């Protein structure tokens, strides 16, 4: 009996020490020690932060596909966030981060559970130029029985520069993401997660990334459903049609050869990372820049293990995709990204009006997809359609926001939903978020507290606790729980459900009307339908050489 009591005491002592020191798990490359935390509603959960999933992409590995990680000795301290990837930060207007940045963050309420939990992965946005997985905390998600994972991936030219051949194939950032998805598949069991029930989510560039993973052979079998919040690979800002031209422009800025791609690649690998990222900043066409020219692209036939070999719209129409369910979404004032930033400086809107014809090609992202002879007339058509032909200013600001939102996000999110439903024959859902809560991403960009509407990413910030941001208003808390219920029901059953709402109808394959659910409040949720979601008919009429009008020959005529 005494021996039994001693044995029990030692077990309890061991558990107590484990609790005080933080949770530990063993993954393929070694032992991790995280930390215990408390969720929004007081639930205990474990966080494992700054967990490496690939070798640092430095030196000879810069621009290359991610390389397998070697085992580490001892115990890896996973109790704190590590560096974001090297980037230009639009908010801080400076360069931050490190090239040694390929980390995941794993949050789990039951690291030692017998019953495996569904997994939700979130890919951060930031125009493929800035951001980090650690900016999105698991504190709200941990009120549900699921495992939540965020990740870093290479950004800007370090993640997406391409020489158009095997020297620098491009898409390194997307290959990082795919490598991280495989890491989750192979290791998430050790955190109590179910590798056979993975929901891939992301917002903005992260939402477009989700779409890209549906199209990439590298990511096949790594997830089972997805949510593309406010992002589509059909949007022009998410895909480069002139990657070599842009790569050479950057090489010239940092003093590298542009005549031979081998020499160019070698030179770029030996330039300091900060110099390369700063070179990108020098390429900006306007002083208010929230998008980068270094984005995903189709890779050359000579590239081994390509992420993408077809133009996204072509791949989708060919049905060359992972056939699993999909949710897409928009907010009611998507165009506040980037238009909210125009409010931070009183000189911006007058400058935009004075140079409308020149700047419209950049803010609406058609510099590389519209022939020169059409640019003046298209700029005027946009102003006529959305601003009634009036000057850009505070009086027409709302129209400018809608124009930017429809062009950069909504029209192509709707197009993604309809094509996915038709080609995959899998359940496809759309929602539109129009509830203004206490915090808005637009306030961060505008640097004021004005109510401009429901910004791009406001729904995601509420769910995933960006930065972090929080609210105490009862209706906001109810709205957050409603969105969390949506994600949780979808992650567990494959069917999204919203409390206090009608049945969420799927997108009907082959139909011109797009069915979507409008989320205007926790108790104001309704089904709606539109044959012109995001005013796609107007945007499709302007002659952009994109999507259904894309051809390689057209690229050379611009």
PLM regions and their residue ranges:
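A structural signal for well-ordered alpha-helical segments within the folded catalytic domains
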Residues: 46, 99-102, 175-178, 182, ...
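Surface-exposed helix-capping loop/turn segments at secondary-structure junctions
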Residues: 108-117, 188-197, 257-261, 394, ...
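Short, solvent-exposed turn/loop segments enriched in Gly/Ser/Thr/Pro and often Arg
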Residues: 201-205, 431-439, 502-511
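Non-catalytic accessory segments of hydrolases
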Residues: 2-3, 12-174, 195, 299, ...
